[in-house]
């Protein structure tokens, strides 16, 4: 049976494991360092099989050997962002975690595609790529799928349309410098830039940028996990099924958009083995300038890594 492993059984990891097993295209292994947590959550999820009708198995483990032969490994392990905590402050702790996770995952699944969710995700995706030694297209991070989902929600509410009618385009850092692209965000096929004023577009963009922090402020003791897990599940499905679907993801750039040796959110075509193609949009001067500013933010984070 094909296998997908989820590293980290916190809110994002466990909810993702649930979403993946309900899609029923592969067995799912949920791994965590805390004994009992992945086992208990996997057992709970497995007991919904007769209700939901999925046939594949979900298991929980503390042993990386259980992940052996995974086609895709999703890395959610890391501490959750707390109120007032920036993504940058997560870096030192999550770097150590990522180093251990990548080493163990590739020991048992050397052919796996890595999907990185741990924050700050652009920098963690870069770190996973460097640590793994994998080709750049076999390492991809959560970015614009989630940010775009947030944007689509607010655009849909503003215009009175179904969120599924919005095809969002959010590029750059998954963080405060992310770049919403109104010209490339489509609502029923029409550019957002033609449907709202520049001021309204900026207002919607700011709401999307602050979407994660807004949830953290409400929850007080945690961060978002429903939309993030749904976003990652969509990415995993596109990779596993080889759909060729275009999504905005954190990707290693090598000349695209004039950038090299950096991970940044850009449109990519996902398929078997990870990223099949990086889409280069015809950005105007202002759009490109904003993307370059966002890139500088990520470069500063990458420079602080201990590599």
UniProtKB/Swiss-Prot annotation:
UniProt keyword Oxidoreductase, yes or no: yes
Reaction(s) this enzyme catalyzes, per UniProt: (S)-malate + NAD(+) = oxaloacetate + NADH + H(+)
Enzyme Commission number(s) from the entry: 1.1.1.37
Record GO terms (molecular function): L-lactate dehydrogenase activity; L-malate dehydrogenase (NAD+) activity
Signal peptide: none
Keywords linked to the UniProt accession: NAD, Oxidoreductase, Tricarboxylic acid cycle
InterPro entries from the UniProt entry: L-lactate/malate_DH, Lactate/malate_DH_C, Lactate/malate_DH_N, Lactate_DH/Glyco_Ohase_4_C, Malate_DH_type3, NAD(P)-bd_dom_sf
Pfam family for this entry, one: Ldh_1_N
Active site: 174
Binding site for substrate: 81, 87, 119, 150
Domain of life: Bacteria
Residue numbers binding NAD(+): 8-13, 32, 94, 117-119
GO terms classed as biological process: lactate metabolic process; tricarboxylic acid cycle
NCBIfam families hit by this protein: MalateDH_bact, PRK06223.1
Function field: Catalyzes the reversible oxidation of malate to oxaloacetate.
Family membership: Belongs to the LDH/MDH superfamily. MDH type 3 family.
Descriptive protein name: Malate dehydrogenase
Gene assigned in the entry: mdh
């Amino acid at each position: 049976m094909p296998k997908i492993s989820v590293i980290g059984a916190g809110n994002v990891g466990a909810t993702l494991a649930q979403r993946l097993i309900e899609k029923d295209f592969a067995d799912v292994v949920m791994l965590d360092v805390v004994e009992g947590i992945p086992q208990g959550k996997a057992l709970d999820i497995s007991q919904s099989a007769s209700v939901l009708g999925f046939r594949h198995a979900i298991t929980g483990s503390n042993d990386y050997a259980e992940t052996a032969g995974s086609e895709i490994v999703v890395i959610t392990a890391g501490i959750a962002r707390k109120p007032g905590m920036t993504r940058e402050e997560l870096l030192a702790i999550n770097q150590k975690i990522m180093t251990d996770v990548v080493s163990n995952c590739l020991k048992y699944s050397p052919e796996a595609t890595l999907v990185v969710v741990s924050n700050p995700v652009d920098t963690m995706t870069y770190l996973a790529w460097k640590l793994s030694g994998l080709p750049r297209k076999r390492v991809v991070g959560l970015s614009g799928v989630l940010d775009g989902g947030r944007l689509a929600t607010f655009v849909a509410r503003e215009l009175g349309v179904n969120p599924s009618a919005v095809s969002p385009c959010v590029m750059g850092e998954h963080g405060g410098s992310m770049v919403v692209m109104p010209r490339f965000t489509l609502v029923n096929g029409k550019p957002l830039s033609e449907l709202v004023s520049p001021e309204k577009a900026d207002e919607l963009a700011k709401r999307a940028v602050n979407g994660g922090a807004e949830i953290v402020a409400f929850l007080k003791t945690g961060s978002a996990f429903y939309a993030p897990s749904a976003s990652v599940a969509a990415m995993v499905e596109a990779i596993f099924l080889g759909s060729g679907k275009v999504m905005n993801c954190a990707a290693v750039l090598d000349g695209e958009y004039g950038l090299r040796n950096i991970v940044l959110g850009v449109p990519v075509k996902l398929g078997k083995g990870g990223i099949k193609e990086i889409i280069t949009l015809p950005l105007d001067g202002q759009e490109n300038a904003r993307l370059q500013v966002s890139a500088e933010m990520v470069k500063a984070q990458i420079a602080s890594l201990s590599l």
